[in-house]
Amino acid sequence: EKTLYSFADEVVMYSDIPAGDNEIIARIGDADAVLLSYTSQINRYILERCPNVRYIGMCCSLYSPESANVDIRYANERGITVTGIRDYGDEGVIEYVVSELVRCLHGFGQKPWEGIPREITGLKVGIVGLGKSGGMIADAMKFFGADIAYYARSEKKEAGAKGYRFMPLNELLTWSEVVCCCLNKNTVLLHEAEFKALGNRKILFNTGLSPAWDESSFTRWLEEDNLCFCDTLGALGSTALLTHPHVRCMQVSTGRTRQAFDRLSEKVLANLSEYNG
């Protein structure tokens, strides 16, 4: 926070979430730059009423204009620079996946998944989306002795060098005992055919910010002997599913750790420094 004063003559901080667009407009006022949390959005309506804005720093992940909480295309038309960050909260998410999977397999605080405790050793783990977090989950599972395969938009040489097998999506789903979906926000890959390929007696993790499935197909799959883990309601999709006996949703963002906030702050300030030259 103190470092921000080296970039501007005046800094105004708000610690609460604005109630709506008009409150955001009032808060921005005649500011040249805006720093924005993931909890709020800056749309075209807001930007049209804040003509002085020249820079928007997203203090959250930016993967694509479609998934952003800023109307990036309109901002670019106006000559407004929009920056975002990535890869600041992955470590906590990986720890969550390992922790919940170990508890499930061993039966810590619950019945063991296979009736008797088992290790991750030899477990068939499929990763859907081998980006930064997906790759880290794959590496963690490999460390514990799992057999790793993955689906991504293209085969990755570095993954092959580690012994990870590239598979078509439906083949991967059928092969896997545990599937981890690590996709960008609003990316939906699991529909009726995919859940049919996945089959029953499977464990599904979703570490994304939104559901990786269409809800009707997912709900039917849950009715069988399957289990789904999500850390947040955003990843699960529907409050009605929170009480489903085959859903484990903590409603806590596992990537929001002390270290993640440090990494986030450093990256936001680095973007500001680059913008200022």
Locate predicted features.
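N-terminal glycine-/charge-rich "phosphate-binding" loop or analogous flexible N-terminal tail
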Residues: E1-A31, G145, A149
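Active-site regions of enzymes building and remodeling cell-envelope glycoconjugates
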Residues: F7-M13, R54, G160-L169, L242-Q251
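Rossmann-like adenosine-cofactor binding region
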Residues: G29-D32, I42-I46, E155-A240
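Phosphate-coordination loops involved in phosphoryl transfer and adenosine-cofactor binding
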Residues: V53, T121-K124, R201
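C-terminal helix-to-coil terminal segments
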Residues: N76, T81-V93, Q110, F229, ...
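Glycine-rich NAD(P)-binding loop of Rossmann-like domains
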Residues: G107-I137
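NAD(P)-binding Rossmann-fold cofactor-contacting core
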Residues: F143-G160
